Amino acid sequence: MTVQKPIESLSPAQAKREHRRLGEQITEHDRLYYQEDAPRVSDAEYDALRRRYEALETAFPELVSAESLTKKIGAAPAEKFAKIIHKVPMLSLANIFSDEEVGEFVARVRRFLGLGADAPLAISAEPKIDGLSCSLRYEGGYLVQAATRGDGYEGEDVTANVRTIQEIPHQLQGHAPEILEVRGEVYMTHADFAALNERQEAAGKTIFANPRNSAAGSLRQLDPKVTAGRPLHFFAYAWGEASEEPADTQMGMVTAFKAFGLPVNPLMQLCHSAEDLIAHYHDIEARRALLDYDIDGVVYKVNSIALQKRLGFVSRAPRWATAHKFPAEKAVTLLRDIEIQVGRTGALTPVARLEPITVGGVVVSNATLHNEDEIARKDIRIGDMVMIQRAGDVIPQILGPILDKRPQDAQPYEFPQVCPVCGSAAIREIDPKTGTADVVRRCTGGLVCAAQVVERLKHFASRNAFDIEGLGDKQIEQFYHDGLIHTPVDIFTLQERDARSLKKLKDREGYGETSVRNLFQAIEARRHIPVNRFIYALGIRHVGETNARRAARAFGTFDALRAVASRAEEGSEERSELTNVEGFGPVVAEAIFDFFHEQHNQDVLDGLLEQVTPEPMEAVAKESPVAGKTVVFTGALEHMTREEAKAQAERLGAKVAGSVSKKTDLVVAGPGAGSKLAKAAELNIETISEEDWLKLVGE
């Protein structure tokens, strides 16, 4: 066994030699492990090598380079991203869309601060980068953690991937605060995006739709080596937790970021009136097409940090900032075809196939047409030149045809009366109450229709249903195509059948022993599931998450629901029992009865219940201190997620509302609480902290 010298006793030359030797060893072990599945050292020995390598770089920062293993190579692909709670929430901005609203924003700020029209008020203006928000945490000047924005309160740990972005320093320059969270945007330039797509196409891989999606997808790769091969960039523009603020203004903070070695946007400018802001907005708008990165507006922020703190927050956005969005972009292109897609419930959805055209830096080749009435109302025909509009990340829509360019032989579009997948009749159901036809035409093929089967399987495995890691949409489509999965039952017998099969799943393209083992473990972990998620996973029409929870709460067990629903003919006591469930009605009751009355569904359920156990709904605590009360949660929760808080409150007999009203009994407020807290004070509603809530409910 080699005795290692203490790192503090090494000379720079000795450290450099050991660093190079360790790098070569780790690279070789990575190759043996990830490419040849033939490791020669134990996990503990490998980890010891990595720790020594990283300790050398910490003690001798000059060893860190673009080729450093801690920067971009050798990190194992993660099974999934760990969650990180933002100590200071990464809240979104309110949007404005006109010059008039700029004046209103400035006037609103002045009113809140009690400033007269002539009192000085400085506001910064900067381009709104169209990328992925990211938070970088530095401690002692070193990058220790990076997280995506997520929902603003909880993001994903992407530290290993962020370390591969060359513009982001691993160590800040100068005298940075002991703790500093830098917020900014990860993006991809137009030139890099085009080059990446050329490489993707040459390799026969997926072409990315736009630079933003490409940047987001690249940063969220489970394998940091993939991210390292993607040309990502970063602009710093805000901060979260900071042990001290190196400046007292927004512009000063950004200047400090630049001094620390962080990239900042050069188009940021200080303005002193609404007129200045509007002029800078239109100046940036005019330059937009010349920039090598996407922007979708201009962000205005009150410059004084002291005034920012006085202004505070409203709802999920700061009162001291707003985003002035650019108007929706339009273009004219050829409508090549109209294709019909069939969804999980049989809905036939028309999709426009367009001659590809670039709109706002994004290549658009598809657009939504909504339904057949929309096509008829706009008189859209195949072969038309059509005006399309794209606003932000919204799916492009067709505004209408350019009639003076319509071909003479263009015919009115005839919406199909049969399903294009299975050939079953496609009908528009009649509402028995109003006698009007549904706007959606649906395939009547049910489980005979392959398109519906695939979509139902996707729904079954989706996040809010069984949430099976590694069984996404693409995997389900492939497994269905290969005959491996046709019903939900097949998911839970996949491992057993694979063991007997001559063609193993691990030998298929895109799979290996590790990925297959992980998939089987993920499936096994879902053999016990809360009954409300089980009900939701079945994909019963009109039964979303809320109605699934209502059914579970009303009947307690799946067997009880099934027994009632199977006998719930029109006019029966069981139908009344279904109809009287809180939030239900005749339409939902009819849909549930239809589902359980269909013999194929009963057969699938019988097989599924041999594989899976729906766990009964916990009984509501009728004697808890919050039973029967309406509760609102607002702000950032530090001890539980919003979903966990909601589930806990409902389990204790409370009703959770999304807004504060006279019917609200209690508001639980965390950091960043805004308008809901103010509304509660206005209505004299009891408000408590998250800690007080946990004491109240005894958890």
Curated annotation (Swiss-Prot):
Cofactor names: Mg(2+); Mn(2+)
Region Disordered: start-end pairs: 1-20
Enzyme class: ligase
Signal peptide stretch: none
GO CC entries: cytosol
Alphabetized Pfam families for the sequence: BRCT (PF00533), DNA_ligase_aden (PF01653), DNA_ligase_OB (PF03120), HHH_2 (PF12826)
Domain of life: Bacteria
Binding-site residues, NAD(+): 43-47, 92-93, 126, 149, 185, 301, 325
UniProt keyword annotations, A-Z: DNA damage, DNA repair, DNA replication, Ligase, Magnesium, Manganese, Metal-binding, NAD, Zinc
InterPro entries: BRCT_dom, BRCT_dom_sf, DisA/LigA_HHH, DNA_ligase, DNA_ligase_AS, DNA_ligase_CS, DNAligase_adenylation, DNAligase_N
UniProt keyword Cytoplasm present: no
Catalyzed reactions per annotation: NAD(+) + (deoxyribonucleotide)n-3'-hydroxyl + 5'-phospho-(deoxyribonucleotide)m = (deoxyribonucleotide)n+m + AMP + beta-nicotinamide D-nucleotide
Binding locations of Zn(2+): 419, 422, 443, 449
GO molecular function, one term: DNA ligase (NAD+) activity
Limits of the BRCT domain: 621-699
Keyword presence, ATP-binding: no
Function: DNA ligase that catalyzes the formation of phosphodiester linkages between 5'-phosphoryl and 3'-hydroxyl groups in double-stranded DNA using NAD as a coenzyme and as the energy source for the reaction. It is essential for DNA replication and repair of damaged DNA.
Classification via NCBIfam families: dnlj, PRK07956.1
PANTHER family: CHROMOSOME TRANSMISSION FIDELITY FACTOR 18, DNA LIGASE
Protein name: DNA ligase
Encoding gene (name): ligA
